[in-house]
């Protein structure tokens, strides 16, 4: 308050000084005194403003300093915890160890100011950057083979992180920053394969990506295309290139199907081959391991639409499994808040509203039993038919019937042939029951679930400026043509 009064007084003084200076009421020495006083006042105000800014900056950066201090103290804490755990092994029972482990899992490090800014930057990379830059930013492994040639790879965890908002890249890894592994002998690739992520399902799709389960740039484009394209689009594309009508396509026809589907996706439209970084699409749009998986070792086999749709289903299952495991399930269950986070990950909801929705979930289901992967998978199977679900719920709405939990379960049984548990319905209604009357907010639910199904990959990879310029140019052309060639009456 004192600073504001001083600023006001100095301003008034400057105004009066200006008026008197122009009227010539003061002599020259008095003018000099007033000028010196005004200069001193301005200097004081500038110093005060600088102190205020320094204080505000220090308060804003306190979370960063606190976070760095926490990171420096983490190794010491780990050593102390190891020493304590060694002593506990000698003096306590296995039950005490389980309790200590559960308490350790409950501790969650608070996200600091720096991490929030980094995650916002990474979200912009996911939303607006080219596939080449996204791949180079989120890939973590660079392998130099026996010939000295280097190639960048993603692990399955990197792939999930590259398409999931608010998932921070590990420290010291970023754009063109990788863990480098050089060829050092015959067992080199065996060591690489031993380091790959372990999956719950032995028939995971990622095991078809060569013996190491790593994802090249061509595989990255192919997998994102498969994830972002509805099943119906693939069915139509296969029928278009199935000239003899036997329901099968060969390798050449499949390359044409890929090219057409990829050109319709936002990721494919943004891609440009970049020889400087080595991120160019190989012939066929996918790796030799995937083409071997589809067409056999001699590449002379046939691929049916049913086989390809099964590949798409298994890929969606594996990515969903990785997303589930990233939440560190306890006894095979994740919390209701984590399940809500999975549903809202690609919603585009403002962060403040998102936090409030998650807080409501945590408060309402404080002592709940959690959600299993089977329940999560059933709900996402229900979401695969989201367009039919939208139609069914619209019928209920137009008929004047309320969309309650029983209605949702009936729609799931009718449309998707799955049974939703009562607990999952409770969580969904807690998120999307805006007015608390026990009825679903249909429009918001369907809009968010459509974005969740495509994982945000269907959104245009630009900020709208190029589309605006293109529309203005088209309008100008049409207007000029109409002016030059007026319509005859």
From Swiss-Prot:
Q: Which GO terms describe its cellular component?
A: mitochondrial inner membrane; mitochondrial intermembrane space; mitochondrial membrane; uniplex complex
Keyword list (alphabetical) reads: Calcium, Calcium transport, Disulfide bond, Ion transport, Membrane, Metal-binding, Mitochondrion, Mitochondrion inner membrane, Repeat, Transit peptide, Transport
Against SUPFAM superfamilies, the record matches this protein to: EF-hand
Q: Look up the domain of life of the source.
A: Eukaryota
One GO BP annotation is: positive regulation of cristae formation
Q: What are the boundaries of the region K/R-ring? A: 133-136, 270-274
Q: Where in the cell is it found?
A: Mitochondrion intermembrane space; Mitochondrion inner membrane
Positions in coiled-coil regions:
none
Q: Where does Ca(2+) 2 bind?
A: 433, 435, 437, 439, 444
Transit peptide, from-to: 1-34
Regions of compositional bias (Acidic residues) in chain numbering? 81-101
Q: GO molecular function: any one?
A: calcium ion binding
Q: Where is this region: Disordered?
A: 62-109
What the record says about its domains? Answer: The EF-hand domains have high affinity for calcium and act as sensors of calcium levels. Lysine and arginine residues in the K/R-ring mediate electrostatic interactions with mcu and play a key role in mcu inhibition in absence of calcium.
Q: Into which family does the record put it? A: Belongs to the MICU1 family. MICU1 subfamily.
Per the entry, what this protein does is: Calcium sensor of the mitochondrial calcium uniporter (mcu) channel, which senses calcium level via its EF-hand domains. micu1 and micu2 form a disulfide-linked heterodimer that stimulates and inhibits MCU activity, depending on the concentration of calcium. At low calcium levels, micu1 occludes the pore of the MCU channel, preventing mitochondrial calcium uptake.
What is this protein called in UniProt? Calcium uptake protein 1, mitochondrial
Organism of origin is: Danio rerio
């Amino acid at each position: 308050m004192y600073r504001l009064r001083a600023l006001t007084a100095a301003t008034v003084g400057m105004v009066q000084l200006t008026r008197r200076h122009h009227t010539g009421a003061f002599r020259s020495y008095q003018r000099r005194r007033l000028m010196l006083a005004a200069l001193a006042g301005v200097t004081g105000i500038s110093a005060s403003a600088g102190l205020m800014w320094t204080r505000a900056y220090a308060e804003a950066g306190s979370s960063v300093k606190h976070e760095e201090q926490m990171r420096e103290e983490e190794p010491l804490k780990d050593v102390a915890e190891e020493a304590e755990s060694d002593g506990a092994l000698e003096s306590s029972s296995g039950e005490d160890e389980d309790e200590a482990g559960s308490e350790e899992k409950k501790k969650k490090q608070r996200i600091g100011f720096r991490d929030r800014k980094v995650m916002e930057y990474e979200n912009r990379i996911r939303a607006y950057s080219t596939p080449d830059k996204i791949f180079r930013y989120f890939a973590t492994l660079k392998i130099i083979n026996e010939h000295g040639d280097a190639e960048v790879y993603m692990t399955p965890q990197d792939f999930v992180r590259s398409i999931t908002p608010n998932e921070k890249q590990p420290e010291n890894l970023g754009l063109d920053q990788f863990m480098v592994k050089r060829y050092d002998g015959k067992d080199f690739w065996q060591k690489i394969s031993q380091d790959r992520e372990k999956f719950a399902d032995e028939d995971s799709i990622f095991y078809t990506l060569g013996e190491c389960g790593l994802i090249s740039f061509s595989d990255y484009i192919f997998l994102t295309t498969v994830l972002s394209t509805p099943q119906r689009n693939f069915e139509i594309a296969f029928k278009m290139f199935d000239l003899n009508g036997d329901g099968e396509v060969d390798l050449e026809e499949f390359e044409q199907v890929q090219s057409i589907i990829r050109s319709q996706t936002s990721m494919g439209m943004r891609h440009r081959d970049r020889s400087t970084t080595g991120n160019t699409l190989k012939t066929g749009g996918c790796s030799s391991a995937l083409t071997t998986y589809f067409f056999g070792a001699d590449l002379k086999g046939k691929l049916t639409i049913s086989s390809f749709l099964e590949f798409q289903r298994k890929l969606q299952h594996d990515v969903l499994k990785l997303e589930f495991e990233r939440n560190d399930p306890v006894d095979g269950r994740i919390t209701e808040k984590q399940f809500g986070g999975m549903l809202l990950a690609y919603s585009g909801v403002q962060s403040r509203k998102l936090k409030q929705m998650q807080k409501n979930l945590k408060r309402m289901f404080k002592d709940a039993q959690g959600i299993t992967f089977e329940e999560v998978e059933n709900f996402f199977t229900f979401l695969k038919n989201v367009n039919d679900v939208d139609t069914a719920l619209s019928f209920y709405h137009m008929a004047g019937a309320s969309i309650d939990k029983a209605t949702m379960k009936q729609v799931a049984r009718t449309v998707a042939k799955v049974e939703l548990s009562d607990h999952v319905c409770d969580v969904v209604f807690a998120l999307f029951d805006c007015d608390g009357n026990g009825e679903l907010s249909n429009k918001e639910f369907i809009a968010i679930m459509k974005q969740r199904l495509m994982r945000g990959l269907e959104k245009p990879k630009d900020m709208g400026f190029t589309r605006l310029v293109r529309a203005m140019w088209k309008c100008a052309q049409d207007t000029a043509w109409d002016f030059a060639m007026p319509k005859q009456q």
